Amino acid sequence: VFGVLPLLAAGGLAFAAVKNHRIQTGNDAFIPAAWHNLRTDEIFPDLLREPSTGGQQAPGWVRQGIVKDSDCKKALMPRLASVAVENGCTTVLRATYVDAGGEAAATVALCVLGSNDQARTIERSGLSVVADHPGPMVVPVAVPKTAAAGWRTSLGHGGGTMSPTLFGPYLAAITVGPTDPDRRYGNLPGEWKSSGQPESLVYQSLSTDLLFAFSHSFDKAVDGR
């Protein structure tokens, strides 16, 4: 009887290995098609905010509208569009968000490229959201009858890119700025007035936080299938 136990254990380990391989193989096949197979509200959830690390939860950003399957050259700012096309960009999905106070807008993009290596190549080319002044990367999408109705390219002050998954052929990109088209550049809204930072740095900081939140959300959605 005792001689059977190791065989059973080994059999169990072998079965687990085969099962895990099948799961990984299925996930590997799903990842490149995730942008097409996930629902739009799974890619761009109603609310985006950084994962809680204890303490008070950030209020987050509320989705205003979604644009599906846009041409790469039309959806991205020229600086990113050219390098994205060179790296196999086939389509771009975009969604516009507004912060909880309604004072800042952001258009987030999911770019479908040729490979994950190509996405990381773009990140390393100085367009990363954590690079030195990467600037707006996505053509803003205005959403009528919302706080983002006046959102447009000239209002974009911050932005950047990030690879949202470890293996997928995706690049996340963002443009952030004020929702008020009549507000003069340099006049900070709300509690940001006392931050002591130039406006471009404030919106760049918002870009970083929101793109990290989106990347975490998208990666979780892909892994959860």
Provide a role label for each language-model segment.
Residues 1-35:
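Hydrophobic single-pass membrane-targeting/anchoring helices
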Residues 24-26, 137-225:
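Extracellularly exposed regions in secreted/surface proteins, prominently low-complexity, repeat-rich
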Residues 30-62:
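Short extracytoplasmic
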Residues 53-103:
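Short, compositionally biased low-complexity segments enriched in polar/charged residues
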Residues 77, 119-123, 211, 215:
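Extracytoplasmic/secreted envelope proteins and their assembly/folding machinery
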Residues 90-137:
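Mid-length scaffold segments of soluble, non-membrane domains
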